[in-house]
């Protein structure tokens, strides 16, 4: 019965349904990005016939929503939260502060002047 078991994902962070959904969105976007870029180029190329551009527009709109880059949301690698994320460290503000105070983040220390 192990063939029906879900595949193990090596996300390396806290896992809940939202994190799993975000992971699948990132995979779908990565696979479909070259096709989306090609279709967008065809749509914006005014030297091509209008019918070709319209067909490309239709194909682009029929692609799955998860292939859009706006569907991807930055999430904390420690807690899975999606708000208050520091982009450079991929952590929420609170987790960043706690890790910085404990000295777990190299090159970061509390400011004093």
Curated annotation (Swiss-Prot):
Keywords: Mitochondrion, Ribonucleoprotein, Ribosomal protein. InterPro entries: Ribosomal_uS14. Disulfide bonds: none annotated. One of its GO terms (molecular function) is structural constituent of ribosome. It is found in: Mitochondrion. GO terms for biological process: translation. Gene3D superfamilies: 1.10.287.1480. One of its GO terms (cellular component) is mitochondrial small ribosomal subunit. Its main location: mitochondrion. Belongs to the universal ribosomal protein uS14 family. Component of the mitochondrial small ribosomal subunit (mt-SSU). Mature N.crassa 74S mitochondrial ribosomes consist of a small (37S) and a large (54S) subunit. The 37S small subunit contains a 16S ribosomal RNA (16S mt-rRNA) and 32 different proteins. The 54S large subunit contains a 23S rRNA (23S mt-rRNA) and 42 different proteins. PANTHER family: 30S RIBOSOMAL PROTEIN S14 (PTHR19836), SMALL RIBOSOMAL SUBUNIT PROTEIN US14M (PTHR19836:SF19). Component of the mitochondrial ribosome (mitoribosome), a dedicated translation machinery responsible for the synthesis of mitochondrial genome-encoded proteins, including at least some of the essential transmembrane subunits of the mitochondrial respiratory chain. The mitoribosomes are attached to the mitochondrial inner membrane and translation products are cotranslationally integrated into the membrane. NCBIfam families: PRK08881.1. This is Small ribosomal subunit protein uS14m.
